[in-house]
Amino acid sequence: MTTWRAAELVAVRAETDTARTLTLRVERWPGHLPGQHVDVRLTAPDGYQAERSYSLASPADGDLIELTVQRVPDGEVSGYLVDGLEVGERIEIRGPVGGWFVWNPERDGPALLVAGGSGIVPIMSMLRARRRAGVGKPVRVIYALRDPGQLFYRDELAADPDLFLAYSRAAPPGDPRPPARLSGAELTDHGLTPSPELTCYVCGPTGFVESVSAALVSIGHEPARVRTERFGPSGR
């Protein structure tokens, strides 16, 4: 098992009212791949410890990593990371973890990236890695969320021509799409044509992931080419 490493918070950036991005400097960080995640451990003064897993939001950059954390109700770890941890303070990190939900833009083929809510975090790592590598492999991003107030990486994604936003409860003024759940027809219209080279990556809450995965298979994507990452109330 990978050892725990000390990680110092060096910068923070608000994403929404309930989420922020943490930039951490990790001692002896070995590097990571787009789509991987880490385990975070907090230790209280009385010795009580709590652990949670969080996706990495950016590609490898020396000893720096980024995590985007959304506060969940009664979340003892997410609440502290969003509201309590201050620049200069330390937590413990273990990882990187995961080898299945990984897309390397320099090595792998085209990708359809589908995110629900905070499931955009590992997808963002993939997009940033693609931009950094300067490769032109076809990519489409479909990002489903409740309302504009839940949108992560607002400015960065606004400049992405390959992005389709699907709001389920409230849409911004002027949005031509009325609020509704993401449909199979939209996966077809805004995705990529199924092919042996294409891999689909789906990340979000369990119900969303199951629904989207089934829809992708129903429109012709090979089940083996649909990779998923899901989380629950006490997850990432």
Q: Which stretches of residues belong to each language-model region?
A:
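FNR/FR-type flavoprotein reductase catalytic core
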Residues: 73-236
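Ferredoxin-reductase
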Residues: 2-89, 145-147, 167-170
